[in-house]
Amino acid sequence: MYFHGTTKVNEKGHLEIGGVDTIELAQKYGTPLYVYDVALIRERARGFKNTFDELGIKAQVAYASKAFSTVAMIQLAEEEGLSLDVVSGGELYTALVAGFPVHKIHFHGNNKSRAELEMALEHQIGCIVVDNFHELDLIDSICSEKNVKTNILLRVTPGIEAHTHDYILTGQEDSKFGFDLQNGQAEKALQIALNSNFVEVLGVHCHIGSQIFDTTGFVLAARKIFEKLKEWKDRLSYEPKVLNLGGGFGIRYTEEDDPIPASQYVKEIINEVKKQVSAYSMKMPEIWIEPGRSLVGDAGTTLYQIGSRKDVPNVRHYVAVDGGMSDNIRPALYNAKYEAVLANKPLAKADETVSIAGKCCESGDMLIWDLPLPKADSDDILAVFCTGAYGYSMANNYNRIPRPAVVFVENGESMLVVKRKHMRTSSAMICL
């Protein structure tokens, strides 16, 4: 079994993360429980930042907070010197509550409301990433009404299809996101923005997908963008101060995945940008990237308590846990795969193959199919690895199941950062 970060087996024979026994965590905080290895998050963040520093490149590494957005996580991002990518008023509000520096916040989203844009402008955030003509007009209108100015990036779709799941492809031409680079939409948006008295176009942004395991797509996207930048330089006398190439850097969920180091992504992206800058006699822009999953994904582990069991002779053994698609919808949504162990006996020999069923009243609520495990008994604790991204952030109250708690662990200490929801709080907003 592959253990990430500080995860190991302790002297009790239990799984340990951040120097804390996971069985003790389950007893103290209950299950299901999201557990985050803070040291690993720090290591991942520094892997990106340090590479830019070593290369002498002016850059911003913006944590894509949609992967996992809590006050504690945003404060950790600030500690590590990151900028912040938010995609909704809710994420922006969380950042403000966390006290994150507003000048380092970048606001994304394909359908920002007037209220969300007004919030962003009121707090003078660092940059709004404009996704469409409606938004461009709306920003100009609000700025005119309030007599304020703002920085923007134009999100473009370069026509690059990254090798990933269809639902997380975003850079190809047939996408709900961004201005098309090839059909003239992006240039038209740039002309409109350059003629505005209220926006400064810092540059362009693209995001080609997620869970990407090589640099080919990023290199091709940079080439496509620079081809247009050269045309815009000649026709519009425009050169960007910022080039944001998004995120999408892959992580290891199972042995089928083969991610590359953060340093390799950064070095190959910068190498290509330098080539393009030289070829077209342009100024080197500041480079922004937006890692999310790659910062927190493998730092998260979810603990479940095993409950019932169903054996179908010669077909399958089902083992049910006290969570499921209400705390991790990715298996149902993306057919996502995970690895897991019994936290109370992680080194025990696997002597059967079981499928882990969630507790939701839904036949598709299956967390893991065909998982080799030692004999799993009721009240054993199952630890599912690499649930740090899009687990908590996509959690829901399906079947009126309360959302789990979130705990940070580091240097032998645990800290509750999100309280467990209870039935009374889950029902508090219902009007009779």
Swiss-Prot record:
Keyword Amino-acid biosynthesis appears in the UniProt entry: yes
Residues that, per the record, bind pyridoxal 5'-phosphate: 248, 290-293, 390
Pathway: Amino-acid biosynthesis; L-lysine biosynthesis via DAP pathway; L-lysine from DL-2,6-diaminopimelate: step 1/1
One annotated GO molecular function: diaminopimelate decarboxylase activity
Residues annotated with N6-(pyridoxal phosphate)lysine modification: 66
CDD domains found in the cross-reference section: PLPDE_III_DapDC
E.C. designation(s): 4.1.1.20
Matches recorded under HAMAP family: LysA
Organism the protein comes from: Bacillus methanolicus
Any Pfam family the entry gives: Orn_DAP_Arg_deC
The protein's name: Diaminopimelate decarboxylase
Coiled coil regions, renumbered to chain: none
